[in-house]
From Swiss-Prot:
The modification Leucine amide is found at L9. This is Extended FMRFamide-6. GO terms for cellular component: extracellular region. It comes from Striatophasma naukluftense. It is found in: Secreted. Its main location: secreted. GO terms for biological process: neuropeptide signaling pathway. FMRFamides and FMRFamide-like peptides are neuropeptides. Keywords: Amidation, Neuropeptide, Secreted.
Length: 9
């Protein structure tokens, strides 16, 4: 999801 993508930054 988008939240997960943010954490992967």
């Amino acid at each position: 999801g988008r939240a997960d993508n943010f954490l992967r930054l």
